[in-house]
Design a protein with these regions (language model features):
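Positively charged, aromatic-accented nucleic-acid-binding surfaces
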Residues: 1-45, 63-152
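Short, basic alpha-helical nucleic acid-contact segments in DNA-binding proteins
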Residues: 50-62
Length: 152
């Protein structure tokens, strides 16, 4: 997996951003480019489907898909455009609703599924009290020691 993160998944890591509170997000327009969507209108349709899935799963759409306005230069003038600061879950839903014919969509599905699972495991671990955490770590160390003993 670490080799995959370093190569195939690098495009998703490169556009990931982190807020001051440590939460991660991706700009929708940058994600659209990585997912090979040339037209924003086509990607916006995918975002809308992902928002519906988000709402139907009981999540707060405004928390996972917060809309932001950006100012861009268009020749001599400037104009405001809509973008989104997508949560990891929002990105996961987007790649699940993306064009399945695109290879990068399959990579995105795998990347965001793995990252979402990792975050869920970390969140569950962090909710444990100190004694329970110690037991989990102790069990992990026991398994790794058994693997080392078998390899020796």
């Amino acid at each position: 997996m670490s080799h995959l993160v370093a190569t195939e998944y690098k495009c998703f890591e490169d556009i990931r951003r982190t807020r001051s509170d440590g939460s991660e997000y991706w700009y929708a327009r940058e994600l659209a480019s990585v997912l090979d969507y040339a037209k924003w209108e086509n990607f916006a349709k995918v975002i809308k489907r992902a928002m519906i899935a988000c709402e139907n799963s009981g999540h707060d759409v405004s928390a996972d898909f917060p809309e932001v306005r950006k100012i861009v230069e268009a020749g001599a003038a400037t104009k405001g455009i809509v973008d989104y600061e997508l949560s990891r879950y929002a990105c996961y839903l987007i790649v699940q609703n993306g064009d399945p014919r695109k290879e990068v969509i399959a990579l995105g599905q795998t990347y965001f599924a793995i990252q979402t699972y990792r975050q869920e495991v970390a969140d569950r671990f962090n909710q444990l009290d100190e004694d329970s955490r110690r037991l989990v770590v102790r069990g992990d160390i026991k398994q790794w020691n058994q693997l080392l003993a078998e390899a020796a």
